[in-house]
Swiss-Prot record:
Assigned protein family: Belongs to the KdsB family.
Pathway noted in the entry: Nucleotide-sugar biosynthesis; CMP-3-deoxy-D-manno-octulosonate biosynthesis; CMP-3-deoxy-D-manno-octulosonate from 3-deoxy-D-manno-octulosonate and CTP: step 1/1; Bacterial outer membrane biogenesis; lipopolysaccharide biosynthesis
InterPro entries the UniProt entry points to: Cytidylyl_trans (IPR003329), KdsB (IPR004528), Nucleotide-diphossugar_trans (IPR029044)
Protein name as catalogued: 3-deoxy-manno-octulosonate cytidylyltransferase
């Protein structure tokens, strides 16, 4: 990341109250703070740009604002996280000053600053439309687990490759590493605007992976390799683990 990128980047954190496995997830207490505030704090530690939380409930709006972070109310009926991010972008930056949009998921309260910064690195190449992250798989079970999204790509360097496909299947075939995709994205503003204007694609619907819409439309996604998968909080057990991690850091 260079200074020019940092000055033109906007970090958007979507926070959705309607979680089936963990109702009220953004407000879940982690070490005395709502989870969404912990995520905003982690994003602030990365020092990559202005931070805005895209919320869909007044209680979350109040929690974020009370903690000193910027919140924007968005619709509750968005079909995807990208649509919510786009609405928040238009409201937060109507003048179009932010050239890069970083989407940090609102259920990553323990994420380190490093991966957030790493997501910007592929955008140093002006040909890259979207950047994202991945980790080499070391657990054999993950290779066949459809809930672990794999990314298949063409190497650009030891730490980066160009995405050719994302899949829930075990791929690619043969000897060599497999990679676990991390759903943290950095978009060029124009790429996000193009993406949300497209209809869901055939492969996107088949795999239930919206990033395939971008690939099918000919957009370029480059992937930075990082060391570990951040904990996503989806269940009460995940929440307990996040509490232990942040308590140990205190």
């Amino acid at each position: 990341m260079n200074r020019e990128q940092a000055g033109k980047a906007l970090v958007l954190i979507p926070a959705r109250m309607a979680s089936t496995r963990l109702p009220g997830k953004p407000l879940a207490d982690i070490c005395g703070l709502p989870m969404i505030v912990q995520v905003a704090r982690r994003a602030a530690e990365a020092e990559v740009g202005r931070i805005v939380v895209a919320v869909d409930h007044p209680e979350v709006f109040a929690a974020v604002s009370d903690a000193g972070f910027e919140a924007i109310m968005t619709r509750v009926d968005h079909q995807s996280g990208s649509d919510r991010i786009h609405e928040a972008l238009l409201k937060a930056d109507p003048q179009g000053e932010a050239e890069i949009v970083i989407n940090v998921q609102g259920d990553l309260p323990t994420i380190e600053p490093g991966p957030i910064r790493a997501a910007l690195k592929p955008l140093e190449n002006p040909s890259t439309d979207i950047a994202t992250l991945t980790v080499a798989i070391t657990d054999e079970h993950e290779k066949t687990n459809p809930n672990v999204v794999k990314v298949v790509g063409s190497p650009l360097s030891q730490s980066r490759f160009r995405a050719l496909y994302f899949t829930r299947a075990t791929a690619p075939y043969g000897e060599g590493p497999l990679y676990h995709h991390i759903g943290l994205y950095a978009y060029r503003r124009r790429a996000l605007e193009t993406f949300v204007s497209l209809k869901p694609s055939a492969l996107e619907k088949r795999e239930s992976l919206e990033q395939l819409r971008a690939l099918e439309a000919g957009m370029r996604i480059d992937v930075e390799i990082v060391d570990s998968v951040p904990l996503g909080v989806d269940t009460p057990a995940d929440l307990d683990k996040a509490r232990r991690i942040l308590s140990a850091r205190a």
